[in-house]
Amino acid sequence: KDKMPNTAGSLAMKDSFPLHDAFLVEKLRKSGAIIIGKTNLSEWANFRGMMSVSGWSGNGGLTKNPYDLTRNTCGSSAGSGAAISANLGIFAIGTETNGSIICPSSVNGIVGLKPTVGLVSRSGIIPISVSQDTAGPMTRTVKDAAIALGVLTGVDEKDAHTLASKNIAKTDYTSFLKLDGLKGKRIGYSKKSSGNVKVDFLFQENLKFLEKEGAILVEISEEPVSNEIQGKSFDLMILEYKDGLNNYFKSLGPNAKIKSVEELIVFNKNNPEEMKYFKQEFLEMTQATKGMQDENYAKLLKEIQEGSRKNGIDATLKKYKLDALIAASTSPAWKTDMVNGDNYIFEGSGAAAIAGYPSITVPMGNIDGLPVGILFYAEAWSEGKLINMAYTFEQKNPQRLVPQ
């Protein structure tokens, strides 16, 4: 499939055709990938309104979970998760600011790999946060994720963050597909309850498996990224969102139907079909800011990055001499509720997402027929190590239940 519109699921962008392929799409084509289509997503990557329904967009309607059509797919890469789980393709590209690869991969029973920010170019992708956004592969196996990731990496002059990956990024991650990823590895975990007793029990059972495979489990007493930093990351995203969207609209040329966040807000107000389930508080919040020109932006960015990196994940890994950290990826899929919105219980993806560090989720079991993933995450540029751990876990403890 070629020459498709790029819509973020919005009716405002229904006939919006980019002037160029995204950098990662160019990479895929050059590698011989056959692009068969685009999937639905949570509109505006689940960053339009407070009562949003994951997997719903004005343009595409509601994405349904292949394990139970009344259950949610999570998001924002909702269609990517459902399509790969349902065997409609070998892999899909998801994007994540916080949870949008990991959560839909977990609840749809597949593998999701969120790379370090800067390993994969974002140019051509509709943005939320320049400091957190990334694209990554969503697949049924760790092997497929490793193959796909190697195709996606590369320095792109249109995305300055990719310069940091020079001489670090690999074009082949399959060398990490070995069965020695757990033995002798020090892996940190928290005993703090997820809020779901069945998830806690399943996680504990998988801890026993990790120990059996020779991993050294280390209980950590604090969260790698504090609640304060996690809260402030939302404020940062709101500031970055305005600049990101306005710059994207500008890239579409002078004939673009929507040219600014302000015009997008007006379109939504004038089109009740867009607003029938939830509103657009996040768009209105970002429009009310000065964006990245806000006088507190640089200070806030530094505080969040230091708090999540040097004084967060890096400090935790160093303090406990860890190779990686693990958590349950998220709760099982909830019943879709078009009135009250999403019913998250918890997500394990926040720390790595805010830091811009890599993480990978792999199926660890099922609760009442609904899949749940386990999340491995570590320092920047540690994709190879995480693939090695996840591959060993997957191959020696296969837990993927095929949807019927």
Residue ranges and their predicted role:
Residues K1, P5, Q132-T134, H161-N255:
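Gly/Ser-rich, acidic/histidine-flanked active-site/gating loops
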Residues K1-D2, P18, I34-I35, L41-W44, ...:
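Solvent-exposed loop/turn segments at secondary-structure junctions
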Residues K1-F17, S42-N46, T162-T174, K178, ...:
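Short, well-ordered alpha-helical
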Residues K1-L11, F176-S190, I238-R309, T361-P371:
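Short helix-loop capping/hinge segments that flank enzyme active sites or metal/cofactor-binding pockets
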Residues K1-N98, T116, R140, G184, ...:
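Gly/Ser-rich catalytic/binding loops embedded in alpha/beta enzyme cores
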Residues A22, E26, K30, N65, ...:
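Solvent-exposed, polar/charged alpha-helical surfaces in well-ordered, non-transmembrane soluble domains
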Residues K30, I34, G89, E284-Q404:
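Glycine-rich, small-residue loops and helix-cap segments
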Residues K30, I34, S85-K191, Q204-F209, ...:
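Structural helix-boundary/capping segments
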